[in-house]
Amino acid sequence: MSSPHVLVVDDTHVDRHVVSMALMRHNVRVTAVESVMQALMFLDSEHDVDMIVSDYCMPDMTGYNLLMEVKKSPKLAHLPVVIASSDNIPERIRKCLDGGAKDYILKPVKIVDVPRIMKYI
């Protein structure tokens, strides 16, 4: 079986790197992009993604916007999406979970969060 492939979406380089490195330590292939638009373009051309881990707060479009685009697409709706954010706002968390996110993890994402993320692959 090949390694799972996770798309990491975050506008902050450090956060993208931390999440990517944590996942790669668990033999996960990672593609990291810095915007929702880049993520959507990648998903349109790439079909072997097993999961998306996305920041919530990004310029132009949020992680919630990405979640909605994924869930309304027949070819992507099956993908698990985990939202990561430094904002512990109950209404936002509920909105993401009600919208179909598998989980909402508070940043900074830590090594101990990886098994929590991996269980959705």
Curated annotation (Swiss-Prot):
Induction: Not induced by cytokinin.
Biological-process GO terms, alphabetical: cytokinin-activated signaling pathway; phosphorelay signal transduction system; response to cytokinin
Changes after translation: Two-component system major event consists of a His-to-Asp phosphorelay between a sensor histidine kinase (HK) and a response regulator (RR). In plants, the His-to-Asp phosphorelay involves an additional intermediate named Histidine-containing phosphotransfer protein (HPt). This multistep phosphorelay consists of a His-Asp-His-Asp sequential transfer of a phosphate group between first a His and an Asp of the HK protein, followed by the transfer to a conserved His of the HPt protein and finally the transfer to an Asp in the receiver domain of the RR protein.
Residues modified as 4-aspartylphosphate: 55
Database matches in InterPro entries: ARR-like, CheY-like_superfamily, Sig_transdc_resp-reg_receiver
Keywords in alphabetical order: Cytokinin signaling pathway, Phosphoprotein, Transcription, Transcription regulation, Two-component regulatory system
Biological role: Functions as a response regulator involved in His-to-Asp phosphorelay signal transduction system. Phosphorylation of the Asp residue in the receiver domain activates the ability of the protein to promote the transcription of target genes. Type-A response regulators seem to act as negative regulators of the cytokinin signaling.
Protein family according to the UniProt entry: Belongs to the ARR family. Type-A subfamily.
Entry protein name: Two-component response regulator ORR8
Originating organism: Oryza sativa subsp. indica
UniProt lineage: Eukaryota, Viridiplantae, Streptophyta, Embryophyta, Tracheophyta
